[in-house]
């Protein structure tokens, strides 16, 4: 994916050039016209879109116009459950909840425990499935009710997916998936077949509703290869093409392009206690100067600062965020003070999230699609 950065569904490395990535994938930048169309139907625009976290799409305008015609559609995203959830994972889910609330549509959420088992030589299947149930608590904690959220744990809920997946698999050649995902002769056949399952969920609402029901998929840009293939074969299977809305990666606390589960200090996890959260924030990389004197004299650079990045995520007030930006640039705001302000915001969010998360424990099966379909 270029000499300076790599972006695949399984690996993100280097400083990501998002415009270059857009050209390579062939997705479209999100325009002011499309944002205005969203505002027309939703009544407002979520800060994650206004502030550029979601920046690209495939046929986002189509799904909005489809909605305007009063036709049915659904939302779809997922999670590869290989460990605990951090804030970066939750960004598409937060927008997913907003869309569901604004438009009253159902959500299909895939937990790909099979994929993580196939991909990680050390991962036991029971471990991946266990993480699927744990991660589901974080999704439910965002406020979804079982009438709107349909969880699909691949190894537990395969029945409604499999007939679609085999039709999808028949349309995908080895050469196609090899070129798309970079599979090699040493790739196990589970991983090679897996894209059929992720694609299948994009077509599942049409099967369940017995009428064309396209999906909107808010997800990180690294998932685009799956949905390019889904769009390529949709017509041949008589399904509507899935539409997508792509986010950038959430900057790591270390200043790198993306949080990494392999470096716990690069991310804030939903189950981090408050002491750990504060420690991570206070030790985060910043766009500030080496000394307070230099900061006051020259100001900082919020554009490269993960602390400011997090303020944009957790402060809904545009004026407040802009004041932080300007005070940083002018030198009126020092990094230590800025970090403490951020800790207050994140601490409040996580305290409430953890409480809702624990209330969801033992209720995951109420949300599972195959349980509802029995």
Curated annotation (Swiss-Prot):
Specify one Pfam family: tRNA-synt_1b
Q: What class of enzyme is it?
A: ligase
Is Ligase among this UniProt entry's keywords? yes
Q: So which residues are the signal peptide here?
A: none
Q: What is its main location?
A: cytoplasm
EC number(s) stated in the UniProt entry for this protein: 6.1.1.2
Q: Name one GO molecular function term.
A: ATP binding
Domain of life per record = Archaea
Gene Ontology process terms (BP): tryptophanyl-tRNA aminoacylation
The coiled-coil regions, if any, are none
Which InterPro entries has this protein been placed in? aa-tRNA-synth_I_CS, aa-tRNA-synth_Ic, Rossmann-like_a/b/a_fold, Trp-tRNA-ligase, Tryptophan-tRNA-ligase_arc
Where is the motif named 'KMSKS' region mapped on this chain?
258-262
Q: From the UniProt record, list the reaction(s) this protein catalyses.
A: tRNA(Trp) + L-tryptophan + ATP = L-tryptophyl-tRNA(Trp) + AMP + diphosphate + H(+)
The record's annotation in NCBIfam families points to: PRK12285.1-4, trpS
What's the protein name?
Tryptophan--tRNA ligase
Biological source species: Pyrobaculum arsenaticum (strain DSM 13514 / JCM 11321 / PZ6)
């Amino acid at each position: 994916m270029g000499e300076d950065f790599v972006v695949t569904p399984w690996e993100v490395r280097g400083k990501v050039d998002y415009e270059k990535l857009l050209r390579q994938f062939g997705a479209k930048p999100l325009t002011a016209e499309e944002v205005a169309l969203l505002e027309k139907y939703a009544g407002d625009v979520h800060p994650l879109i206004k502030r550029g976290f979601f920046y690209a799409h495939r046929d986002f305008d189509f799904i909005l116009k489809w909605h305007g015609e009063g036709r049915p559609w659904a939302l779809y995203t997922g999670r590869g459950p290989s460990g605990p959830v951090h804030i970066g994972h939750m960004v598409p889910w937060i927008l997913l909840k907003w869309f569901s609330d604004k438009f009253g549509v159902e959500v299909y959420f895939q937990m790909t425990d099979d994929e993580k088992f196939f991909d990680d030589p050390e991962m036991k299947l029971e471990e991946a499935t266990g993480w699927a149930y744990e991660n589901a608590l974080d999704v439910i904690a965002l406020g979804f009710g079982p009438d709107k959220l349909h969880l699909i744990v691949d190894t537990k809920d395969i029945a409604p997916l499999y007939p679609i997946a085999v039709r999808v698999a028949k349309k995908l050649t080895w050469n196609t998936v090899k070129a798309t995902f970079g599979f090699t002769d040493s790739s196990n056949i589970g991983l090679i077949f897996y894209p059929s399952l992720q694609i299948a969920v994009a077509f599942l609402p049409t099967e369940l509703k017995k009428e064309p029901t396209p999906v909107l998929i808010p997800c990180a840009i690294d998932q685009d290869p799956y949905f390019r293939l889904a769009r390529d074969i949709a017509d041949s299977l008589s399904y509507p093409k899935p539409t997508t809305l792509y986010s950038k990666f959430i900057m790591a606390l270390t200043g790198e392009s993306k949080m990494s589960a392999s470096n716990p200090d690069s991310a804030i996890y939903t189950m981090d206690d408050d002491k750990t959260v504060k420690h991570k924030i206070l030790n985060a990389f910043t766009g500030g100067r080496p000394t307070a004197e230099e900061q006051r004299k020259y100001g900082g650079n919020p554009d490269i600062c993960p602390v400011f990045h997090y303020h944009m995520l957790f402060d809904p007030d545009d004026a407040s965020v802009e004041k932080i930006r300007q005070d940083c640039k002018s030198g009126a705001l020092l990094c230590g003070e800025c970090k403490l302000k951020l800790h207050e915001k994140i601490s409040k969010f996580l305290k409430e999230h953890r409480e809702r998360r624990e209330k969801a424990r033992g209720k995951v099966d109420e949300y599972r699609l195959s349980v509802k379909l029995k």
